[in-house]
Amino acid sequence: MRILCTNDDGIYAPGLEIIEQIAKDLSDDVWVVAPEHDQSGVSHSLTLNDPLRLRQIGPRHFAVKGTPTDCVIMGSRYILADKAPDLVLSGVNRGRNLAEDVVYSGTVAGALEGTMLGLPSFALSQEFSMETGDRPVWETARTFAPQILRRVIEIGIPKNTVVNVNFPACAPEDVAGVLVTRMGKRNLGFLKIDERRDGRGNPYFWIGFEKADDADTPASGSDLAAIAGQCVSVTPLRLDRTDEAFAAILTAKLK
């Protein structure tokens, strides 16, 4: 099995080393094609107005000056043009990709691109807490991912479906279980604009985040609830975002 690994945190991110280790538990034919620089939050963007720069940094290791989407296309259609990958793994992201995160996430987008290209794909993310800070417990993802991937691959991923896996911010021995979940929803009040001033007094801005009022009470069965309960969350996501129920209403009313 040929595996293509990518991420959005960049070619030198610790999580990329973890996902390569996970991939090597499944196969000895593992290739890494990741962004030259951090691409967190770029979503499913595609580079069209600038050239892509490709740099080989080691055996089967390549850096692309582009997005995770660019990396998956470059990996599958150019670097591995002789024999396409059988599996795409994107991650392991530093931080969770739950609920609305999946819309912004370059990690999830890398897996979505793999799915669009007809390749079974997973996005993997490791939550971290205030206690762990800059030191996510990578061993949790490292411990649980191989067995989850093997089982899902054995079952078979439906066409046009990507599997989003999130690992809780706790040691492997403290994980409460593995749950199949649905995409959750947050109170979007967590987004804010942080205004500051530079040395000349000119304003500049950061998009910031703050805890929402309902952050501690996620809906039962959601990815948010699973992670809050120290469980691994496995969420199948579909490429087809059609709202079938509303489409039926529109069909009846727009005649």
Swiss-Prot record:
It is an enzyme of class 3 (hydrolase). One of its GO terms (cellular component) is cytoplasm. It is found in: Cytoplasm. Keywords: Cytoplasm, Hydrolase, Metal-binding, Nucleotide-binding. Pfam families: SurE. Gene3D superfamilies: Survival protein SurE-like phosphatase/nucleotidase. GO terms for molecular function: 3'-nucleotidase activity; 5'-nucleotidase activity; exopolyphosphatase activity; metal ion binding; nucleotide binding. Its main location: cytoplasm. A divalent metal cation binds at residues 8-9, 40, 93. Binds 1 divalent metal cation per subunit. Its cofactor is a divalent metal cation. Its EC number is 3.1.3.5. It catalyses: a ribonucleoside 5'-phosphate + H2O = a ribonucleoside + phosphate. InterPro entries: SurE, SurE-like_Pase/nucleotidase, SurE-like_sf. Nucleotidase that shows phosphatase activity on nucleoside 5'-monophosphates. Belongs to the SurE nucleotidase family. PANTHER family: 5'-NUCLEOTIDASE SURE, 5'_3'-NUCLEOTIDASE SURE. This is 5'-nucleotidase SurE. It comes from Nitrobacter winogradskyi (strain ATCC 25391 / DSM 10237 / CIP 104748 / NCIMB 11846 / Nb-255).
